Amino acid sequence: MSTRTRLVAALAGAGLMASALAGCGGGPSGGGGEGGTLNVLFAANAQFPTEQQEWFKTTSATFKAQTGSDVTFETFATANDELTKIQTSVVSGQGPDVYGLGTTFTPTAYSTGAFVKLDDAAWSTIGGKEKFVPSSLGISGPDAGNQIGIPFVSRPFVMVYNKDLLKKAGIDKPATSWDELEDQAKKLTTGDQHGIATAYKDNFDPWKLIWGMATQAGNPLIDGKTVKIDDPAVKKAYETYFGWLTKDKVVDPAAVGWSNTQALASFAEGKTGYFLFTSTLASITLDKSPVAGRYAYALMPTIPPGATSRPAGGLDAASILSGDNLVVADYSKKQDLAFQFVKMITDKDAQLEYYKIFGNLPVNAEAASSLTSDPNLKVAAEALDKSVATPFSGGWGDVQLALTNVVVQSIPGLAQGSVSDADLAARLADAQKAGQSAVDRAK
């Protein structure tokens, strides 16, 4: 199949039919001497927007000093924006030279055939695969010989809890199952104090919770070429997630409108037992809040709702294999310059500086090993060890969005206090149809 045909097919799988122009894959090629401007796309950091802009500025200055070339950054705000940018760029054959993509979107990028496949020469240009923490390479491509994603940062997810509130409620250790978490949250909820802080309106958090519960129950959501959204394990996951608000009343009703940043801010006030699906970067906020010195991290529950142990086929998934990968556009005429940029921001000192500012764990092996004295990293490292990659399918981006859309469509019902079985069933059926269609078309 030609690159042009592969692109059209892949983009159809992502929901966009159009003619596409792109070159062939391989190692670094194309212009890349001094001068000119490199274009880089990153996710907008809603939690630390000012710090991100300052990082853009200092990184650009460093790159200018090293190469004589400028860097311009643009950002995307949502998963849908991320997908749209990939689509429009590969169709037109122009756009960013370097993309910073969430790990779960790497399969979608790979399926287009529009990003440089990393041969030995390409890896050597940036310091070799041995430069990176081995587990961070787990979603760089479908296999070790077909990779496009260069690890940038790792973000294994954990939960954070208020030590004082748990002790006061007679809870001696954090929950390890979702049912136990529900029981503890009920004990923690009293007056204006709530058991759980979560973000129903966040663009990323909801689907991760659903994926985690389903994966622990033995449903990977994509099994080969079969999507399994309209499934009892997935339905149970949504019922549990929605039930914290509608049935158990352990979540602040305002959470229907919260982003992850707002949920973190609520936990930081000191009136919530648990904050779910965060990372150690939360410490930057928490250490300046009323809960400073009163919180600790723990693994997310790994036993699915309604169970006391994982069933056959269930995975010990404490987190998605989460973080950001860097990919270089095949259409870029500045690939040599792009790989110089990638090398610069994945070197040890740059990685440690990024960790200091944002709290994201380094994927540079030398940088990561230098942080072992940080007590927060013990839990994060365990979460990384128990991280499971989302399915490497070109249709995953749409499956992820379909899972999110079930929550988006349920927000009005959540705000009113209930989501009916009929409404949930209909939304799961629609999500199943959309996801299966995307996977069927993906290459």
What are these regions (language model features)?
Residues 167, 383-443:
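Conserved C-terminal helix/tail region of periplasmic/extracytoplasmic solute-binding proteins
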Residues 103-156, 208-209, 214-216, 296, ...:
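Hinge/lid segment of periplasmic solute-binding proteins
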Residues 2-107, 307, 434-443:
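Conserved N-terminal structural module of periplasmic/extracytoplasmic solute-binding proteins
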Residues 185, 226-255:
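Glycine-centered hinge/linker elements that transmit conformational signals in sensory
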Residues 144-152, 157, 179-230, 239, ...:
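Extracytoplasmic/periplasmic solute-binding protein
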Residues 62-132, 167-169, 173-176, 274, ...:
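Extracytoplasmic "Venus flytrap"/periplasmic binding protein-like
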Residues 243, 247-248, 288-357:
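Extracytoplasmic/periplasmic substrate-recognition and gating elements
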Residues 302, 310-311, 355-402:
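Long, aromatic- and glycine/proline-rich binding clefts that accommodate carbohydrate-like moieties
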